[in-house]
Amino acid sequence: MSELGSIRESIIHLCNKFPNKYWRELEKTKGYPDEFVKVLSAEGFLSVLIPENFGGAGLGLEAAGIILEEISRSGGHPGAFHAQMYTMGTILKHGSEQQKQNYLPAISEGKLRLQEFGVTEPA
């Protein structure tokens, strides 16, 4: 099986542990999927786009897309995971070396969640 096929099978297996009832309850209570996020972090799915030298998997957008696709297919809402996976790209592209060292390993380990960021532009 290819690496991407293995990723797909792994995320399907993980998503099957969180039935529709889990997602419906979160929607009803307007809750955040903390338990699901913890498992995704522990399994390394939220750090697929972070380079290996910062503790991530160093995979590409196709792997990230597969993960989000299978979360959606299983009945989950990928919004919270999309933010975690993609907004750290701002640190990779525009962050100082110190910021990369401070934040990316912690994101990779699931100790830090980066859900949003602000942008300012000169007037």
Go through each PLM region and give its residues.
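Glycine-rich flavin
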Residues: 20-123
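Flavin-dependent oxidoreductase catalytic core characteristic
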Residues: 1-17, 53
